[in-house]
Amino acid sequence: MDALEKSLCDFTGSTPLDQRFRSLFTIKGLAATSDQHMQRAISIISQAFSDDSALLKHELAYVLGQLEDARALPTLKKILQDLSQDAMVRHEAAEAMGAISDPSVLPILEQYRSDSDVSVRETCELAISKISFDNSEEGQALKQSKAQAKLAEEQSGLGGVESAFKPIDPAPAMTPAASKEAARSQADGVRYDASHVPLFQSTLLDTNLSLFERYRAMFALRNVAHGGGDGAIQAVLALARGLQDGSALFRHEICFVFGELCHPASIPSMLHVLNDTKEHEMVRHEAAEALGGIVEEGEHAANDSANDYTRVLDTLNKWAHDMDAPRVVRESCIVALDELAYNNDPTQFHRIETSTPVAA
């Protein structure tokens, strides 16, 4: 991992940001291969928080959460407590604690539930709710069911909706029938389709409900969209309606979901968000990164999406070079352009994990 550490922790500016992102996610992949690599990965990623890029540090916190290892908690706690850090970074640290879901972090999350920044407050609220859910009877049943389903998928070589989304969500997807029985069967066979969109949309847009319940509806709509067909477009449009919500955190998560889905129907919404200079930079950054994954020219050209590709490319280039734009927006566009280029021409560069020998 020495070469990866050198790349990720290059604070001189000589290593391009997009290359450092590739190094980060290569480290994330290697972490899963052994406990030794996991410890080394956590150590390297923790060192990288010395960088001055809020975008990179936000991504570092995200990855630490996705590693789902309690040894990352000291670093995440330190970041959340550091009021000099950008709120976007602190929010991601709190969300990462929720992903790891260790009840020992509940006191610090409760403390920062009254933080001066609303995105940090809301994230702490979500993380507390997720940890509570994970340790409830329903959450434990869901965890067991998913573990059994994962084992069955590994044995059969098949996978369903849940296996398509490996990231740990900040809230479990709502089921068509919110019950313990539904939770137990979710990983085994709950089918999300167009008939569920009205219920999920209603929950998503109901500001009288908790943020956690609305997030659950958000990820349920994602699962509907992943199923394809008419339900996919309906679900994407339902999610897009959530972009009118008053919470920047909520809007940014919808953009993240669009990035997971890579559905062409979300392109107009993401372009609108990125071009809206009055929108919160956290939301614009997520829209930019979502656009980087949505369009693959060769795949979609036959579906009359060439114009979409051109618009996305032009818009990302515009904001990547606009020195008056917030730094996190510019850098997100740079990373998105790198992803877009790779998706369309894998021969233009070799990913660092295949071109650079990795020494543990």
Curated annotation (Swiss-Prot):
Catalytically driven reaction(s): [eIF5A protein]-deoxyhypusine + AH2 + O2 = [eIF5A protein]-hypusine + A + H2O
Cofactor notes: Binds 2 Fe(2+) ions per subunit.
Record: residues binding Fe cation 1: 58-59, 91-92
Statement: the UniProt record of this protein carries the keyword Repeat: yes
GO cellular component: cytoplasm; nucleus
Family: Belongs to the deoxyhypusine hydroxylase family.
Name of the protein described by the UniProt record: Deoxyhypusine hydroxylase
Organism of provenance: Mycosarcoma maydis
